[in-house]
Amino acid sequence: MVEVSYKIKNEEGLHARPASDFCKTAERFKSDSTVFKDGEGFEAKSILMVLCLGAVKGDVIKLRAEGEDEQQAIDALIETLDKG
């Protein structure tokens, strides 16, 4: 299992387009990916769940991946969020 914290940098937060990109990235990997905000976990491959986070600029979220390609999944998710 790999787990990292990430501070949202996008001015508009994790809104529809970046959330969609985030989910598409998570779907590319076999690992189970979860995103947490305020201790509550959401399936990273579900656009509805990611939008439910309500993550805005400055929020710190936690990314967790578990499986055979967990490190690659985390790296790709961070890269996707950075492009936001």
Model-identified regions with their sequence ranges:
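C-terminal structural segments of small proteins and small subunits
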Residues: 51-84
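Intrinsic-disorder/low-complexity, polar/charged segments enriched in Ser/Thr/Lys/Arg/Asp/Glu/Gln
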Residues: 1-5, 60-62
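Compact, glycine-rich, soluble single-domain proteins
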Residues: 7-53, 57
